[in-house]
Regions:
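Active-site "cap" helix and flanking loop/linker of ATP-utilizing ligase/carboxylase catalytic domains
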Residues: 1-18, 35-110, 121
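Short beta-strand elements
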Residues: 20-24, 29-38, 117-118
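Short arginine-rich
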Residues: 4, 152-166
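Short, conserved charged micro-motifs
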Residues: 92, 141-148
Length: 179
């Protein structure tokens, strides 16, 4: 509210999605940036759990009736997203490498692949076109299972210079196992 209320008071009411880039500090969270879009990869772990039709949610946002929508999420499952990046990202990386294995996601309910830095080349083939190439997402009964499935799914995809972090979700798993 501290962001949108002043916008409304200035005669510029906001309709849409605001993503806040935050940093946790010893003095509490601090806002680093605002974006009028979904966060990436944050949306990749939230949207698979959304039970509402996203088009209905968007229309309610546009119509100003979002407060009348009962947003429902699958809170019985966990979701993990692993970003497949081009080696060298965020500094320097090459583009244009063919991406193989995307078809392996077809028909698999707990697995998703979100495109970010991709494009079709002149032959109609999907190739790398950015530093953050794909978001490989999986759901599971808990964080440990979702993480295992997401990392397994990263092996379905290949492209030259593929890079990923191997520690996604580990700190939360360690915390949950120690409590």
């Amino acid at each position: 509210q501290p962001t949108v209320d002043p916008m409304k008071a200035e005669g510029r009411p906001f309709k849409g999605v605001i993503f806040f880039g935050l940093m946790l500090t010893p003095d509490g969270p601090k806002v680093l940036e605002y974006n009028a879009r979904f966060g990436d990869p944050e949306a990749q772990v939230v949207l698979p759990r959304l039970e509402n039709d996203i088009v209905d949610v968007f229309e309610a946002c546009i119509d100003g009736t979002l407060d009348q929508v009962d947003l429902k999420f699958d809170n019985d499952r966990a979701t993990v997203c692993v970003i497949l990046a081009s080696d060298g990202y965020p500094v320097e990386y090459k583009k244009g490498f063919p991406i193989e294995g995307l078809e392996k996601f077809k028909g698999k309910d707990d697995y998703y692949v979100f495109h970010s830095g991709t494009k079709f080349n002149e032959n109609g083939q999907i190739v790398t076109n950015g530093g953050r190439v794909l978001g490989v997402t999986a759901t599971g009964k808990d964080l440990k299972e979702a993480r295992k499935k997401a990392y397994e799914a990263t092996e379905w995809i290949s492209f030259e210079n593929k890079y990923m972090s191997h520690d996604i979700g580990l700190s939360l798993i360690h915390i949950s196992e120690s409590t």
